[in-house]
């Protein structure tokens, strides 16, 4: 027992709340963006590859975004700039109403 279990329970609760919020808001967004550190939903995304020496980093600009982060009280963000050297995954969310033949 003890503190670590309580903290774990608290974090599990936060994750659950976050998941419910995610389920509620995903319909508002067009894209899912994953970096090595974060997961975002957004309506506009711009990815620029920038060479530095022999390396490349990615500069992402997201606007009208939502951030998967259990420690933020407000997860809606007007714009986010992310710089990463790791892979970036951008997926367009399919809107169910567009799938009807």
Feature roles, as predicted:
Residues 2-101:
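Conserved RNA-binding domains used in RNP assembly and mRNA/RNA metabolism
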């Amino acid at each position: 027992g003890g503190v670590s279990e309580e903290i774990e329970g608290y974090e599990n609760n936060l994750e659950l709340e976050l998941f419910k919020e995610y389920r509620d808001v995903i319909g508002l967004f067009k894209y899912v963006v994953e970096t090595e550190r974060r997961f975002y939903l957004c309506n506009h995304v711009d990815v620029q590859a920038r060479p530095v020496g022999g390396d490349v980093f990615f500069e992402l600009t997201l606007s009208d975004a939502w951030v998967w982060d259990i420690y933020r009280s407000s997860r809606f963000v007007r714009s986010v700039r992310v710089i990463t050297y790791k892979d970036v995954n951008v997926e367009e969310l399919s809107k169910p109403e567009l799938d009807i033949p």
